Amino acid sequence: MLLYLPQIFSSRASSLLFLVPYLLFWENVASISTCAERDATIQHSLEKLLTLTTFMSHVMSIETAKLFTEFNNQYAQGKRYNDRIPGTCHTAFFDTPVNKEQSLGSDPKTLLKLVRSLLNSWTNALNHLVNEISAMQGDPSFLFSKAREIQAKFDELTTGVKTILSMIGERDNDTHLAWSGLSSLQSSNEDVRCFSFYTLIRCLLRDSRKVNTYLEVIKYQIFNQNNC
């Protein structure tokens, strides 16, 4: 029996973990590759899952902004990190649309695969962010808690995107870009360590906003253009 998605979506406390039976159902359904081949029920279910996934990405970007703001307040005051030449984000080498208008001109399947690759690329980095931020001087308890919350949302969002790919007849992919900044997060030089955290969280915020934008565009394309 399928879960009633509108009821799940109505609660901000809900997460994609409540959709596990629904997601497992889709893993055992033969994927249908085009919108024209789908019946109305399947298309409606796809739209509901897209709505929930897009909402989750919006929440994730908000929580990441809170993490960035709090880190600035606790560890970056007076250090003028924003004036330094920023480190390159490890996901910068993906060929991504530069703005929402360019995203609207992208194929939704290609855009969805890009979202999956961005999420994949943060698995290792987020794990180390959570582990290392707890060792920061002072009281990093809020930062640690928020980082764990964001990591959980990334995992849930990845599950949702993986399921949507299956629903539209696309194979899941493990494409990702490796992160190699652990030594900087563990540096004995406090300034190097703090700036590395600042850069990593800034990149996380950048990518969480990209993921939200791309999912909003994909939802618009499928809802309004019946385009898959």
Swiss-Prot record:
Disulfide bonds join C89-C194, C203-C228. Glycans are attached at N173. InterPro entries: 4_helix_cytokine-like_core, Somatotropin/Prolactin. Expression restricted to the placenta in trophoblast cells within the labyrinth zone. One of its GO terms (molecular function) is hormone activity. Keywords: Disulfide bond, Glycoprotein, Hormone, Secreted, Signal. It is found in: Secreted. The keyword Secreted applies. One of its GO terms (biological process) is cell surface receptor signaling pathway. CDD domains: prolactin_like. GO terms for cellular component: extracellular space. Residues 1-31 form the signal peptide. Pfam families: Hormone_1 (PF00103). Coiled coil: none annotated. The keyword Manganese does not apply. Belongs to the somatotropin/prolactin family. This is Prolactin-2B1. It comes from Rattus norvegicus (Rat).
